[in-house]
């Protein structure tokens, strides 16, 4: 009997354990990374970045019809089930306004990354249209290569370079442009030292030495910023005021629950009309996202 992962959204495709034979059929290169655990069961070495990348290629091909996906070495290799959960919970949030999950939603992904993970899942699951912003030239080029390598995505996903290092929405949301929602996986750590310490904890949990490569990777702008996620999301909240009439819902992942109180205080200060928290769980990991809007319920129900 296959065990279910606790806490995933009901529509998440990843409730069951990985079906490695099916995934190898979707991406044959994965076969080279399969090993046996002490119980004699097939698994992969999650400490090997190339194995994790091959697993992601297989998951995206098998579940989301993504035929071409690759990221440069050293960039964040995201856990697909958790990223899918954010998309499904966001769909539920939008459905509260319209009565059903909108099929023509326009979504802005802040810091879409080299992996383009949120647009890939959102396009396949709901047919949404995405704009992905990215500040890193290398990550932007990687994301564009993914779009160009998959027929049909060029009509659903457009990418936009953020050229201002201190801006989030400014320079990305154009005049007269509207979005049903924004989403973001903000940098969590507040310094390079903190990011390294977090990486070392992950390595210890995997039983690895200090010189081992970290399986999920991550560049500086993906992992840390001055002040950590509270500072980043706070800036996002302040900037969102300027686009209050152009975006129905602003949202962001929040890694730590104790980071919520200062964010709630700031949302009250800037005059957010509605604030929502969505709790999520992937296995033992608890996470959440917050959403805020400057529009009342009636205004959000009306099309732009």
From Swiss-Prot:
PANTHER family: RNA N6-ADENOSINE-METHYLTRANSFERASE METTL16, SAM-DEPENDENT METHYLTRANSFERASE. One of its GO terms (biological process) is rRNA base methylation. Its EC number is 2.1.1.181. GO terms for molecular function: 23S rRNA (adenine(1618)-N(6))-methyltransferase activity. Keywords: Cytoplasm, Methyltransferase, rRNA processing, S-adenosyl-L-methionine, Transferase. The gene is rlmF. It catalyses: adenosine(1618) in 23S rRNA + S-adenosyl-L-methionine = N(6)-methyladenosine(1618) in 23S rRNA + S-adenosyl-L-homocysteine + H(+). GO terms for cellular component: cytoplasm. The keyword Transferase applies. It comes from Klebsiella pneumoniae (strain 342). The keyword Ribosomal protein does not apply. It is found in: Cytoplasm. This is Ribosomal RNA large subunit methyltransferase F. CDD domains: AdoMet_MTases. Belongs to the methyltransferase superfamily. METTL16/RlmF family. Specifically methylates the adenine in position 1618 of 23S rRNA. Pfam families: Methyltransf_10.
């Amino acid at each position: 009997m296959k065990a279910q992962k606790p806490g995933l959204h009901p529509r998440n495709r990843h409730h069951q354990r990985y079906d490695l034979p099916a995934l190898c059929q979707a991406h044959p290169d994965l076969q080279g990374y399969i090993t046996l655990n002490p119980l004699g069961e097939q698994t992969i070495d999650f400490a090997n970045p190339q194995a994790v990348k091959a697993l992601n290629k297989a998951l995206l091909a098998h579940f989301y019809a993504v035929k071409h996906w690759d990221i440069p070495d050293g960039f964040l290799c995201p856990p697909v089930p958790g990223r899918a959960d954010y998309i499904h919970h966001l769909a539920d949030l939008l459905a509260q306004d319209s009565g059903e999950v909108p099929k023509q939603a326009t979504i802005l992904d802040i810091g879409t990354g080299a992996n383009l993970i949120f647009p890939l899942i959102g396009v396949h699951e709901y047919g949404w249209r995405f704009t992905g912003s990215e500040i890193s030239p290398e990550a932007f080029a990687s994301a564009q290569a993914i779009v160009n390598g998959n027929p049909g995505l060029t009509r659903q996903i457009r990418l936009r370079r953020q050229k201002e290092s201190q801006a989030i929405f400014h320079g990305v949301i154009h005049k007269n442009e509207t979005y049903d929602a924004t989403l973001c996986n903000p940098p969590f750590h507040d310094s390079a030292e903190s990011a390294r310490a977090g990486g070392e904890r992950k390595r210890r949990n995997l039983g690895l030495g200090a010189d081992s490569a970290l399986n999920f990777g991550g560049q500086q702008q993906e992992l840390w910023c001055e002040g950590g996620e509270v500072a980043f999301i706070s800036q996002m909240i302040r900037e969102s005021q300027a686009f209050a009439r152009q975006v129905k819902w602003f949202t962001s992942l929040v890694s730590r629950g104790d980071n919520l109180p200062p964010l709630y205080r700031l949302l009250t200060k800037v005059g957010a009309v509605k604030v929502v928290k969505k709790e999520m769980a992937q296995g033992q990991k608890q996470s959440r996202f917050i959403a805020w809007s400057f529009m009342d319920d009636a205004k959000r129900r009306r099309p732009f």
